[in-house]
Amino acid sequence: MREDKIGFGMRLQIVCRETEEEAWDFAHGLVAHASDAQKAFVKERFATSEANRRVRELAATGEVIEKNLFTGITKVRPGAGIAVVGTPEQCADTLQNFIDLGCHSFCLSGYLHDEEAERFGKWVMPILRERNRERMLAA
């Protein structure tokens, strides 16, 4: 019998900027110039993926499914199409909500990869470290 706890992880994009307006402008800019042909290709090519189908269902309700969760990227690429968008505090709040629900690992990326990783490491990680200090010590 398995004695470990089973947890779950999430794959998300991050768009973290100093202001919420900058973050949303960048997020919308990621998909603003996608052609109808590109959107149709992504939709058709990955139609058999259950995970992609479920994300597209969410995206059909609107590009913003929660205060800081953007589905627009699903229109132009498969997988990892949901982005956490906002200021460092807003990004940390959104990820903290998932942590509090039991998410124990994240696979995060962004555009441009190195720049977003640097912003995340400097701005968001310190907030999450502080908020989860006790959890990290107990692990």
Predicted regions mapped to residue ranges:
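Short secondary-structure boundary segments
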Residues: G110
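C-terminal helical cap(s) of enzyme catalytic domains, especially alpha/beta-barrels
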Residues: H113-E134
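An alpha-helical appendage that flanks or caps ligand/catalytic pockets
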Residues: M1-D100, R129-A139
